[in-house]
């Protein structure tokens, strides 16, 4: 065993500096200094910003906070972290010596009529085996690969959180939009029924023609026809919210129906600069970790082109007591290195290297594409949100004008100074404008969420040890 004591450090020293394959360096690419309609100041770490509180809607805030931990997609992503962590342990353990210990004890004997005497014997054996594979970096690169995959798993959790936040807010905004449309339709229905009754009274008095009564009733029926689909869409949105929170689809309809007005945010968004999204967006971080994983696999493939040495040895002491009570023992041992050298493989190992390099190139291109797409998403959301804000402000004024027009038309019709067509047109104009405003408020709120998601804001990452 003295030979083992001296040769193992020798081979370790021989191969410790022989790790093949490229050493990983994070990718870089030129980025614009600012977004086209943004500032030049970094927004820092926006991952912990609870930007949805700008809607000032306690119900929405509670749903987001509940779902970050309850959403099933998030829970699945968290569970995959355990798998990735186990793979790191496996990769690290593979680089260490394999030491096994075994032992046995046997009692044997003979008896019977054919034997003149009966006896038993006791035999004990044990074995201690050591095996250690030394190579050109397979285990080191495998460990690097597993660690990168673990980091990617953490990034996937953050991606799942952002996807949930976007889905829950979008579904909530939709539910409130349909709820608002229902309220508008019911108010319009009341107004049009009043007009219908007034027109019937005028017809009975001979002040208007039968055609006016038919037109007024037709408007009532068209309003009634809107309500069922609006109610169905509200319920569908409520079902989606419940599912996102890990609850049965129909369990939250009544709770959500008690909610308030359409969400309207009351805050500006500091989008920062393009360089910020590389740090803050988990999908970009995952793409970078995938690239690190692919780069490490090049080293794994290249290491298989070189020799590997396995150091192995064993000690197997055994002893026993025979039928006469005499004890004897034997201690065989063995040690020796084994060299494995690939010579002819038909080009398979070289092809593995080429394949690994190609996969790394694809990973880099995916990372670059992620960055460019992220910049585009921020630019698009920023422009769309700002323009939609102008639309909302204009529609609010248009609704005020339509309401005043309807008030004047109603008064004029009652006095007989204007026709029913003027009144019906005023009602229709107000209904259309109110619906347009509700749609614009819905879209504006969604764009606010889209912009915050695009800059990687709000997933509030937990320390790795806490997941």
From Swiss-Prot:
Lipid-conjugated positions (S-diacylglycerol cysteine): 18
Coiled-coil features, chain-numbered ranges: none
Location of this chain's protein in the cell: Cell membrane
Pfam families to which the protein is assigned, alphabetical: OEP (PF02321)
Membrane topology qualifier: Lipid-anchor
Superkingdom: Bacteria
Name this protein carries in UniProt: Nodulation protein T
Species: Rhizobium leguminosarum bv. trifolii
